């Protein structure tokens, strides 16, 4: 996992820092959540499975903390041997984080994909927080029903209802993680928000637009190669 690079000294002696994995099945809003927390377009958004091909690191920094979010692909029910290897690799990476955010869609019933991830999370010893997304589409009793359904399946360290699209209750996500992270200096410069090169971010954004526009017309295994970039 990232090799745990050299720390950068911080003036705040109680500064907190650490790595947080974000997992969940496709179309629950993982990438939308990360983009909203970071305040920039980094992670590709699509309802097709496995559109996030690489583990994307996104960095949130303020005067009190640095949270390194990892949008982790591969935690899904495998269909072949390669898929099994990807799941094992993804779970191993989760074990090296300080916390895990398990993002679910509150407006959908807990399904086989969610249950598979829950079973994998039982192999992880760090705190796992249930993030119930899309609360803007729910009534209070529907939200409560969704929370109870997931709490029956796993002993979460906490539950955070949010709307990533409307940026509702995102501060609670940050506050909960700040309480969870250990004290320590930051890993990345404060102006860094991702480890992804700009060219790769642009190619992913183009790929996202193609997937959204064409949907069933083309497979999700498309590649975009950026030949030239110009600043305007």
Model-derived features: positions:
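Conserved, well-folded catalytic cores of nucleic-acid-processing
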Residues: 40, 59-63, 78, 93-100, ...
């Amino acid at each position: 996992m990232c090799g745990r690079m050299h720390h950068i000294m911080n003036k705040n002696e109680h500064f907190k820092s650490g790595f947080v994995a974000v997992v969940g099945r496709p179309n629950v809003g993982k990438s939308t959540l990360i983009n909203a927390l970071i305040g920039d377009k980094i992670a590709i958004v699509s309802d097709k499975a496995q559109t996030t091909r690489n583990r994307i690191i996104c960095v949130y920094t303020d005067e009190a903390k640095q949270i390194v979010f990892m949008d982790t692909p591969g935690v899904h029910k495998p269909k072949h041997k390669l898929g099994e290897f990807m799941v094992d690799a993804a779970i191993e990476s989760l074990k090296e984080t300080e916390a895990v955010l398990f993002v679910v869609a509150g407006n959908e019933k807990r399904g086989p994909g969610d249950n598979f991830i829950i079973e994998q999370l039982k192999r992880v010893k760090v705190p796992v927080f249930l993030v119930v997304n899309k609360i803007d589409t729910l009534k209070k009793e529907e939200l409560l029903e969704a929370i109870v359904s997931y709490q029956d399946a796993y002993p979460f360290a906490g539950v955070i209802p949010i709307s990533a699209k409307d940026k509702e209750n995102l501060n609670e996500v940050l506050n909960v993680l700040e309480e969870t992270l250990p004290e320590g200096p930051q890993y990345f410069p404060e102006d860094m928000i991702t480890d992804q090169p700009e060219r790769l971010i642009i190619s992913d954004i183009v790929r996202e637009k193609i997937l959204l526009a064409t949907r069933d017309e083309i497979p999700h295994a498309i590649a975009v190669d950026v030949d030239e970039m110009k600043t305007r």
